[in-house]
């Protein structure tokens, strides 16, 4: 489990989500990117994850230029106050973001692009490798697996092992099973239960306000999914997950504080 700097206690690190996209599924993430990010830092975020391309189911791709216009100014400002992750599938955008101050690449396509893989090696940055079946535009159209846990595990570990074989520090590698990215509800639940299969690498969960929670809780809109998101975070704490990506930083930090206090 990750260690929160300064207090000597262990809990999942909290990564606040900033979606600099006009079609983000969570309304409040796309307004006032810098101000919202700095509020997240004040609320206790350890990382800020900034993305300019929507990867929600059915999302359409955008140009590299448009993606950079959305994210680079925010990365430049926020990286002066907090560690920043760039959420992108494009190696050109990732390189510009690293130059602007980002220190992690969060690639939802799981380093499919060899140039992205090479950039991680050359820069020595932290990286989150996520599993996605298909592409955002079609990934939720009847996804199928023979054994979802084994298939996702093999896919992610092959890439992580290859990074390590090329000299990349293991402590800078996070693996994300990709909840909601080419998975049905049962697939998602199986992957969350089996997250230890991704060890010895650090594990990241990104479940905040996703449709999985809406399906379980009968909450069709994202606004009604905070309680379900916190339930997932409590399970992440119990399972010693290393980092979680969330829209609601303060609520998750408070949750972990209470869980720690109850253990004391």
Residues covered by each model-derived region:
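Catalytic domains of carbohydrate-active enzymes, especially glycoside hydrolases
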Residues: 36-51
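Active-site-adjacent loop and "lid" segments of alpha/beta metabolic enzymes
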Residues: 3, 9, 24-36, 55-83, ...
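Phosphate/pyrophosphate-binding loops at sites that engage ATP/ADP/AMP, CoA/4′-phosphopantetheine
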Residues: 41-42, 82-83, 159-172
């Amino acid at each position: 489990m990750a260690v929160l700097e300064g207090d000597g206690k262990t809990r999942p690190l909290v990564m606040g989500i900033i979606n600099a996209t006009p079609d983000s599924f969570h309304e409040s993430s796309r307004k006032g990117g810098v101000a919202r990010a700095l509020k997240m830092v004040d609320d206790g975020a350890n990382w800020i994850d900034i993305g300019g391309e929507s990867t929600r189911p059915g999302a359409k791709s955008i140009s590299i230029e448009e993606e950079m216009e959305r994210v680079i100014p925010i990365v430049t400002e926020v990286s002066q106050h907090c560690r920043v992750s760039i959420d992108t599938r494009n190696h050109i955008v990732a390189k510009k973001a690293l130059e602007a101050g980002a220190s992690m690449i969060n690639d939802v396509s799981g380093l499919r692009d060899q140039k992205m893989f090479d950039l991680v090696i050359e820069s020595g940055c932290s990286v989150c490798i996520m599993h996605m079946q298909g592409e955002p535009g079609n990934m939720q159209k009847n996804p199928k697996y023979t054994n979802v846990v084994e298939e996702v595990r093999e896919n992610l570990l092959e890439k992580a092992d290859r990074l390590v074989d090329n000299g990349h520090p293991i402590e800078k590698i996070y693996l994300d099973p990709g909840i909601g990215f080419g998975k049905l509800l049962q697939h998602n639940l199986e992957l969350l239960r089996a997250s230890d299969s991704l060890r010895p690498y650090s594990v990241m969960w990104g479940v905040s306000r996703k449709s999985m929670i809406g399906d379980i809780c009968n909450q069709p809109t994202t606004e009604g999914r905070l309680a379900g998101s916190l339930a997932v975070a409590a399970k992440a704490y119990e399972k010693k997950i290393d980092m979680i990506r969330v829209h609601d930083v303060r609520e998750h930090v408070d949750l972990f504080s209470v869980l720690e206090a109850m253990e004391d």
